[in-house]
Design a protein with these regions (language model features):
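Membrane topogenic/interface segments and analogous intrinsically disordered interaction regions
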Residues: 1-258
Length: 258
């Protein structure tokens, strides 16, 4: 009896260690992918930062420039931006390594669900960042710059502060664009019914404006640019979730909608 228990314990320990070693290898491969992309891009770090700061530069008055208040800021800020770009480019490799680690432990129907969700999550996050860069940044910066002229003030932003603002905004909009995926997962896993999600729609709208007031600059325009897409994406998630309603509850969903 004791020998059987010790054999079972040693088997569990070996299984745990093998999974731990595999996880380490996956993390190392992901890190190497990011580093490889970063090394390829680092030569163009100043150009990448200039492209990154273009929405603000276009909103500055003629001859306006960004400033550096930290001795090392002009070096490290472009490096940080380049690392961010490298991470986004290498993210499919990172997600593949994560998928390769967890896939053996999933059932076939779970694999069929997760793969499209991973692809859609990555795509929606990138779309959210693009939405912030091409629409939100130019709109907000021009709106804020219009208030400087009557005051006789000149807008000069520190590059480190701009990086912090841009990173926060990118993260906020990237996560916001994940709303349809969250809705689909909640419905497909049976955590919340589709009828219940439709019922709480008014609270979601209020919550969208509360969240936008917390994570965006304190102006109405920025809040609208986050809250309105969040609400529309929630509606999109409800539409897509109809295709993923668990078969066992399809009858209940049909009676609830009628």
């Amino acid at each position: 009896m004791t020998e059987n228990n010790s054999t079972e314990d040693s088997g569990l320990q070996e299984s745990f260690l093998s999974h731990l070693f595999e996880l380490r290898d996956r993390v190392v491969k992901s890190a190497l992918a990011i580093i490889a992309v970063f090394v390829c891009l680092v030569y163009w770090a100043p150009d990448i930062f200039h492209l990154f700061a273009q929405p603000l530069l276009e909103a500055l008055p003629a001859g306006g420039k960004m400033i550096v208040t930290d001795v090392t800021g002009s070096f490290f800020v472009p490096m940080k931006v380049t690392m961010l770009v490298a991470f986004l480019i290498a993210l499919p490799v990172v997600m593949y390594q994560l998928w390769a680690f967890i896939a053996p432990g999933l059932y076939l129907h779970e694999r069929k669900l997760i793969l499209p969700l991973v692809i859609s999550s990555y795509s929606l996050f990138i779309i959210g960042m693009a939405f912030a860069y091409f629409l939100v940044f130019p709109t907000v910066f021009k709106f804020m710059a219009s208030y400087n002229a009557p005051l006789g003030a000149e807008m000069s932003t520190d590059i480190d502060n701009y990086l912090s603002f841009a990173m926060t905004t990118f993260l906020a909009f990237g996560i916001t664009f994940e709303v349809p995926v969250v809705v689909v997962v909640l419905v497909r896993m049976g955590i919340v019914s589709l009828a219940k999600l439709k019922e709480i729609r008014p609270y979601v709208i209020v919550g969208a404006f509360v969240i936008s007031a917390v994570v965006t600059p304190p102006d109405v325009l920025s809040q609208l640019l986050l809250a309105v897409p969040m609400t529309l994406l929630y509606e999109l998630g409800l539409l897509v979730a109809r295709l993923y309603v668990p078969k066992a509850s399809e009858g209940d969903q049909g009676s609830a909608s009628s």
